[in-house]
Amino acid sequence: MAMMKKEIKFSLVYRDMWQSSGKYQPRVDQLVRIAPLIVEMGCFARVETNGGAFEQVNLLYGENPNKAVRAFTAPFREAGIQTHMLDRGLNALRMYPVPADVRRLMYKVKHAQGVDITRIFCGLNETRNIIPSIKYALEAGMIPQATLCITYSPVHTVEYYASIADRLIEAGAPEICLKDMAGIGRPGMLGQLVRTIKEKHPDVLIQYHGHSGPGLSMASILEVCENGADIIDVAMEPMSWGKVHPDIISVQAMLKDLGFQVPDINMKAYMKARAMTQEFIDEFLGYFMDPTNKHMSSLLLKCGLPGGMMGSMMADLKGVHSGINMILRGKNEPELSLDDLLVMLFDEVEYVWPKLGYPPLVTPFSQYVKN
């Protein structure tokens, strides 16, 4: 057994697990059933409950997102588990800019609904889009977790990210999230980045969010933990791995073996939560989940598309597949398989992305590059 190292906490990204697997997430009646089992697992300091595309889906179900958020956060709050949401900085929960007074009000409302932390990101890492939200969240009594959207390009170096972190921390952010939404951040770079931030700002909490799609995530988790990260975002079966996130069981086992202080997992509760999540998938959500999202692919290293977009993109590709082949048949040209289309799409992204200045491929810029 290695020497005891620092404590590492875990956050279950229950919202992102769904968004990265398909188009939708459970109804509120299902969310309130799963929450006590997540609590019972006993290994999560935090749970991602809302934000991102989550609340738009409530509206599609005819649910009131305000009531849904209150209902889902309540069991975690009672158990002393922090809840966190995802917000798009200047764009709040939308795809386009939201007036400042509305954003200011949003944090007050979300805090009243039981959300503790807001993870504020800008797809361009533009601090001017993040800093006002840090101030509004602090005013509302929330913890603003300022985000670095991680990608791999000639521009995105340790120095680049560290200087952004300095500005966000100076603006009042007590926490920094490394949002490796496509899982293409190189483990060595991520470790150096965590060390650089921690050396300068030892009291700032660092949370790592890395998708498992291209296969680097376990090495990245190891590197960030060895260099001072505090919290790791994880998933659980039946929706871990693939384009989603590593499973809590594997991450906990790896870190425990290395001497990190990690919580134990109540496996009875894990299996119950796993079965219940599968039940949600079987009832109707599985219709909107592409089976290929369970696969990891090193091809993703080339295109850098985020886990959260692979679900909707595969559904979109399937939707246009037959139409494209119909046109090709009309021209007496050979038909294309889904794999052919995917490779063409990856090539196109590789061509378009540098021309746009290497924007991190996350909402809304992933959509621009994809479309």
Task: Indicate residue ranges for each PLM-predicted region.
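Catalytic cores and adjacent flexible loops of soluble metabolic enzymes
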Residues: M1-R119, G123-N371
